[in-house]
Amino acid sequence: MSRIQNTFAALAAQGRKGLIPFITAGDPDPAKTVELMHALAEGGADVIELGVPFSDPMADGPVIQRSSERALAKGVTLHSVLDDVKRFRARDQKTPVVLMGYANPIERMGADAFAAAARDAGVDGVLVVDYPPEESHDFAAKMRAAGIDPIFLLAPTSTDDRIAAVGQVASGYVYYVSLKGVTGAANLDVSSIAGKIPAIKSRVPLPVGVGFGIRDAATARAVAEVADAVVIGSRLVQLLEQAAPERAAAELAGFVAELRVAIDGAAKPAA
């Protein structure tokens, strides 16, 4: 099994739900990315999603767009992100790392070269926002051949056919976007999430992580009641945007630890 599959199997055996935080590589400081990844793990992350900055992040709201712009201005590239993962792996061989980004940087490198470089760096999964599942069979096969789980997005508007298409190519987990629109939006409706997950589970035999609109421990706990994992990104990127540089890692770890406690509370039956 892959590192991601092992992680979710262990969570299921413990009756726990996963916590998947997202940060943008290189923001606020390229020299601090590995330190921040360790802070996420120390706070209780089960999987880390590491954003690869891109100049036109169409699925992202203003908070993550700004973080991408800052990282690009500081020279962050797909190659430097892979270097960050390699340096993270020198100390942490347990926590899965998923790269989340857009097709253009991968296509410039070439899928085969990317798969080899990502494998060698210690990447466990890749989520390419603008790769539709129906057109991703070759890419997904190349990733799996390198031991990397191809992860795909589903949304409230996803049809049964689209869900089935994801089921044919995805591994590791699927990321259910709980809101229409862009990352960081508000107005989370947990009951609508709960209503959609059975349709996903019937066609995709993978854990379902839910993200978009999760901003605090209370919403994380509510989502953890109905999902296999909680994905949180914009709130963490905003925290890093506002934190004093010398306090960023500690504040990040502390906030993730609060989410961890809340999610673990959701996973346990009431006494």
UniProtKB/Swiss-Prot annotation:
The annotated pathway is: Amino-acid biosynthesis; L-tryptophan biosynthesis; L-tryptophan from chorismate: step 5/5
| Keywords, in A-Z order | Amino-acid biosynthesis, Aromatic amino acid biosynthesis, Lyase, Tryptophan biosynthesis
Keyword Amino-acid biosynthesis recorded: yes
MF-aspect GO terms: tryptophan synthase activity
Reaction(s) catalysed (UniProt annotation): (1S,2R)-1-C-(indol-3-yl)glycerol 3-phosphate + L-serine = D-glyceraldehyde 3-phosphate + L-tryptophan + H2O
Any single Gene Ontology cellular-component annotation: cytosol
Q: Cite the PROSITE patterns for this sequence.
A: TRP_SYNTHASE_ALPHA
Catalytic residues per the record? Answer: 49 (proton acceptor), 60 (proton acceptor)
Identify the InterPro entries for this entry.
Answer: Aldolase_TIM (IPR013785), RibuloseP-bd_barrel (IPR011060), Trp_synthase_alpha_AS (IPR018204), Trp_synthase_suA (IPR002028)
What does the record give as EC number? 4.2.1.20
Which Pfam families does the record cross-reference, listed alphabetically?
Trp_syntA
Regarding protein family, the annotation reads: Belongs to the TrpA family.
Tell me, what does this protein do in biology? The alpha subunit is responsible for the aldol cleavage of indoleglycerol phosphate to indole and glyceraldehyde 3-phosphate.
Record text on subunit structure and interactions: Tetramer of two alpha and two beta chains.
Q: What is this protein called?
A: Tryptophan synthase alpha chain
Q: Which organism is it from?
A: Burkholderia pseudomallei (strain K96243)
Source taxonomy lineage?
Answer: Bacteria, Pseudomonadati, Pseudomonadota, Betaproteobacteria, Burkholderiales
Gene designation per UniProt: trpA
